[in-house]
């Protein structure tokens, strides 16, 4: 049966080394303490774990395959490439692993209203889905720019019974939607559960989201031993806030020996030198955003700079505290690829494997194109295919002018 692993970090104060913590208004501290206590209790409750396991299997469609991408492996001519097919989950992305867990926790705590922020709309759709499943009232905050880019997901959320509130402030993207969601939570904290979509925000969110997503890496461990009798040599995943990557990395990150190479791929947007990117680790500085100390993008005046990526799910101007810690401690390495490279990865996977990936996942494919050819043929690389690309096809068509 499913267990939620006990990792060595965060510490009792919710810190990963210097990162993480709880930088929030006093009014939210009791709510976060209540949430942490409820989560720690649920994590040890066999009935909660059994129910989560049931919904992950019967509703979401776990376990997902670890698929040998033979044509892609041949094309690159280096290591053998395996894809962790999170794109095959119900709702089309890894987000459902976390939203099911948090919705069950909300119900357990007696909260009948859930709120969420969303960028690409995948998390919003996922929250609207579990709210419908468990009969919860649902409000999703989404930046106006993302509402434009992801019209299909907006309609999906409404179809599932959620109220979508467009946010016109700031850059009108994920950061601004998150600000509004936090404001709502402060106002309605007694009745409302905030389902945060990534490994960001104040403690216990980075820990909780990681634990719910770690099913990805735990499955990869088991499947690797079954398929090729050992652990992979490298794991590659796209990093925005960082939940799909942490879900893959965490079960390997704390291994005393034999840890695969962990590679997180950030969005370089139009190039790191242009200022139009979302590479918080690659080009950011340490600071506090949305209740957590982590790597961020901000200017000389301390103002958060707008993140840019072709992928709506990666344009968050920060990266989770555990990734920030991994980067400093050398547990994982972080690279970045441009919009242009990601679009090439998007097309490549479609043509060689018959799989249209999400633009987020296409960043991981694009970086793999640089490292896999340099590896030996008997080595194994696992790429986390965090979501499917249906939601992105219209935007890609617009960007490429309909020309492939």
Curated annotation (Swiss-Prot):
Q: Which InterPro entries match?
A: Trp_synth_b_CS, Trp_synth_beta, Trp_synth_beta/beta-like, TrpB-like_PALP, TrpB-like_PALP_sf
Among CDD domains, the record links this protein to:
Trp-synth_B
Q: Name one GO cellular component term.
A: cytoplasm
* N6-(pyridoxal phosphate)lysine: residues bearing it: 95
Pathway listed for it?
Amino-acid biosynthesis; L-tryptophan biosynthesis; L-tryptophan from chorismate: step 5/5
* Required cofactor(s): pyridoxal 5'-phosphate
What EC number(s) are associated with this protein in UniProt? Answer: 4.2.1.20
Q: Does the keyword Lyase apply?
A: yes
One of the entry's Gene Ontology molecular-function terms is: tryptophan synthase activity
- PROSITE patterns (UniProt xref): TRP_SYNTHASE_BETA
Keywords of the record, alphabetical order, are: Amino-acid biosynthesis, Aromatic amino acid biosynthesis, Lyase, Pyridoxal phosphate, Tryptophan biosynthesis
Which is an annotated Pfam family here? Answer: PALP
Reaction(s) the record says it catalyses:
(1S,2R)-1-C-(indol-3-yl)glycerol 3-phosphate + L-serine = D-glyceraldehyde 3-phosphate + L-tryptophan + H2O
What's its job? Answer: The beta subunit is responsible for the synthesis of L-tryptophan from indole and L-serine.
NCBIfam families this protein is in? trpB
> Subunit structure, per the record?
Tetramer of two alpha and two beta chains.
Family note: Belongs to the TrpB family.
Q: What is this protein called?
A: Tryptophan synthase beta chain
Q: Which organism is it from?
A: Thermus thermophilus (strain ATCC BAA-163 / DSM 7039 / HB27)
